[in-house]
Amino acid sequence: MMRLLYLGFRIYCFIFRPKTLGVRVMLIQNGRVLLVRQTYIPGWFMPGGGVKRGETLEEAVRREAREEIDAEMGELSLLGIYTHFGEHKSDHNALFLCTDFSLGEKQDSEIAEARFFPLDALPEEVPDGHRQRLDEYRDGVEIPQFGEW
């Protein structure tokens, strides 16, 4: 069902060329990052999703982390705002960093799996934009505040 909805969304994007605003969070603990594999698209991603009307970026990232992986997060740092112009849409994503978090037991039905990976051994299926930001963090490189995702 989720794959069918995703296909419908891609058709919608082709026709209407929407602008989207989303959030992602880099959850780091003991040199490892928590990534999720979704049920409707292949790959491993940092948790996140869309910002709802009337919601701040911080509220959105906290809600998405709770919904997807039952995470309660402490202090957040905004790393930057990144853009991606693919699949006939204009994506804008705010990326946060959190090293103070706890995970519960439940997992959203959209999430097939959540797993920690060492920052120096990420799976091949991590999209380029996610991998670039994770590599910058791992290497201690200053992460640009703006750029491509």
Residue ranges and their predicted role:
Residues 38:
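Short loop/turn segments immediately following the C-termini of beta-strands
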Residues 41-43:
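Short, surface-exposed beta-strand-loop junctions and turns on beta-sheet-rich folds
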Residues 1-24:
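Acidic, metal-coordinating catalytic segment for phosphate/diphosphate chemistry
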Residues 51-74, 83-137, 145-149:
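Unchanged
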Residues 29:
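A cytosolic small-molecule/anion-sensing beta-strand core signal
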Residues 45-48:
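A short gly/proline-enriched turn/hairpin at secondary-structure junctions
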